[in-house]
Regions:
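Hydrophobic alpha-helical segments, especially N-terminal targeting/anchoring helices
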Residues: 73, 163, 365-366, 384
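Residue-level detector of functionally pivotal "anchor" positions at catalytic/ligand-binding pockets or at interdomain
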Residues: 338-371
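C-terminal tail/sorting-segment detector
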Residues: 2-3, 382-396
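Tryptophan-anchored aromatic micro-motifs
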Residues: 24-65, 80-85, 196-225, 237-243
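Hydrophobic h-region of N-terminal signal peptides that target proteins for export
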Residues: 11-20
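Sec-dependent signal peptide hydrophobic core
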Residues: 5-11
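Predominantly extracellular/secreted and cell-surface proteins with exposed
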Residues: 65-147, 224, 230-296
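Edge beta-strand at a domain terminus
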Residues: 22-41, 167-210, 224, 317-347
């Protein structure tokens, strides 16, 4: 994620009371918790420039990709957009009215969220204002209240005013109170398009068996041995990743067996509906000495070589990684599996005891041509059983 911290970005308060007095603000009873009947476009791909508060009382600006978005085209031609604020899902709907041709208009303010203390937050058109002392305010726009969208073909987009000389959106769709107090959440440069990928799914009619997916966890600095279901289908092996969403979705990845090795390519895993994310399995390298926030570098493939002495498919080199990543284009990961290996493959599969007439070389090569040694990590591992319990054992 490309984060730019605005130091400090101050929420407007009583500065906009004059504007509030001239604007009609609907009550909490007008919040739309459901959309009307119509054509639903679910799990679209949203990209945006988004503001959010990480809990510090200031706003951060972030360009986001591969977040989900839902909208409904109602029978009267209007459009209802769910959760218009990426980092503050309200589970409510913003109404966009037809304004001729492919143009839609969000007539603002619209009530979007009611706080525990009864404070109503509204979708409002807002602008950044330089206070002249090195600080910025985000204030309701005094020249115009509405924002416009276009729906052209299968693309829904916010009509933005471009960027100012500081690279900030000239106006945003913000979440604020009637008095102009900004929540530090808002959207600019929003585009919503259909998803172009199909998720990896296990083949139907094939028996599942349990295998061990072992990997290093850099955050606890230890190995994890996790029992996961797997399905073999010819020269392919499918296994369920340990990552699961709070909504209960599970995700499968597929690798292809050839020349005594398993190759895993980038692939779409599916939607995390709880976090509103599109997830991908992305090969990468872990960079333990890196100081960057996300210490991984995306790669073209992940390779697991067969080790006949342990009957295990092992990572071709240390720190090779499989990421559960948001989108396929940059590192923004939900989970990571460093130096992975597969153990206890189904005995009915050709992968469990492959022919050794074309063995994998003892020295492996990464996509950039570096000679790399086989992994040598041994010792104590953490093993997760099928019932969820975790025990320590000696790696063999």
């Amino acid at each position: 994620m490309n984060k730019i911290r605005l130091l400090p970005l101050v929420a407007a308060s009583l500065l906009s009371l004059g504007t509030a007095a001239q604007t009609s603000f609907p009550g909490a009873e007008t919040i739309r918790y459901e959309a009307p009947e119509g054509t639903t476009h679910a799990h679209q791909v949203r990209s945006a420039t988004s503001f959010y508060d990480p809990g510090e009382g200031v706003a951060y600006l972030d360009s986001v990709e591969y977040y989900t978005a839902d909208y409904v085209e109602a029978e009267d031609g209007s459009v209802y957009l769910s959760n218009p604020f990426v980092f503050f899902p309200t589970d409510t709907w913003l109404k966009l009215d037809r304004a001729g041709g492919d143009t839609l208009v969000a007539r603002l303010p619209q009530a979007m969220f009611e706080g525990d203390d009864g404070t109503v937050f509204y979708a409002r058109r807002m602008v950044l204002s330089d206070r002249g002392d090195g600080e910025l305010d985000c204030l309701p726009d005094e020249t115009e209240t509405d924002v416009r969208f276009t729906l052209r073909g299968d693309t829904l987009a916010l009509v933005d005013g471009g960027l100012d000389e500081q690279g900030m959106p000239r106006y945003i769709l913000g979440l604020a109170t009637a008095t102009g107090g900004w929540s530090c959440y808002g959207e600019g440069l929003t585009t919503i398009v259909p998803l172009r990928y199909e998720p990896t799914q296990k083949p139907e009619g094939k028996p599942e068996q349990t295998i061990h997916f072992v990997h290093y966890n850099p955050f606890i600095e230890d190995d994890m041995d996790e029992e996961v279901p797997a399905v073999c289908d010819g020269d392919k092996i499918y296994w369920q990743l340990p990552y699961s969403s709070n909504s209960g979705e599970t995700y499968w990845v597929v690798g292809e067996w050839r020349d005594n090795r398993i190759t895993v390519l980038p692939q779409y895993l599916g939607v995390d509906t709880w976090s509103c994310l599109h997830l991908f399995a992305m090969p990468a390298d872990y960079l333990p000495e890196s100081s960057q926030l996300d210490p991984f570098d995306l790669k073209e493939m992940l390779v697991l070589n067969y080790n006949p002495s342990t009957e295990t498919y092992e990572s071709a080199y240390e720190n090779q990684t499989l990421l559960v990543n948001v989108g396929p284009d940059r590192v923004y990961y939900a989970d990571s599996y460093v130096t992975p290996r597969l153990q206890s493959l189904p005995s009915t599969s050709i992968l469990s005891r492959p022919r050794l007439d074309t063995p994998a070389p003892s020295v492996c090569y990464s996509p950039d041509g570096r000679g790399l040694r086989q992994p040598t990590r041994h010792g104590i591992v953490l093993r997760r059983n099928a019932d969820g319990t975790v025990v320590k054992q000696v790696a063999r």
